[in-house]
């Protein structure tokens, strides 16, 4: 059964709404990273999986004109698949930020 974005967000402990600054602070202590990409914040996070594919991608969108680290963002998408590293997870996120 395919998980919804809400279910995946809960599994990875991703906030539905936040700021880029808070998201980065949450992810950086666990091998994660974020990248500003136009109106989007792209995230690659780590969540242990014994099969070795422990990275996931996520896409957030700015909800206001404030695109600084304190602007409001909302979760748009979380990858169905997991990846072997954060580069592949970030590539997935870039492909979804349209």
Describe each model-derived feature in a short phrase.
Residues 46-76:
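Short aromatic-glycine-(Arg/Gly/Cys) micro-motifs in beta-strand/loop hairpins
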Residues 4, 37, 64, 78-79, ...:
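Intrinsically disordered, low-complexity regulatory regions of eukaryotic regulatory proteins
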Residues 29, 39, 66, 85-87:
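Intrinsically disordered, low-complexity cationic segments
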Residues 70-88:
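A short, exposed loop/beta-hairpin motif centered on an aromatic-Gly-Thr core
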Residues 2-41:
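Negatively charged, low-complexity tracts enriched in Asp/Glu with abundant Ser/Thr
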Residues 89, 93-96:
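Acidic, low-complexity intrinsically disordered segments
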């Amino acid at each position: 059964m395919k998980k919804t974005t809400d279910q995946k967000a809960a599994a990875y402990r991703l906030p539905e709404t936040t700021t880029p600054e808070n998201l980065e602070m949450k992810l950086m202590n666990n091998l994660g990273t974020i990248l500003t990409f136009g109106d989007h914040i792209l995230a690659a996070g780590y969540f242990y999986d014994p099969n070795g594919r422990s990275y996931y991608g996520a896409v957030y969108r700015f909800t206001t004109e404030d695109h600084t680290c304190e602007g409001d963002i909302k979760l748009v998408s979380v990858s169905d698949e997991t990846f072997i590293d954060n580069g592949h997870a970030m590539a997935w996120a870039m492909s979804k930020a349209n």
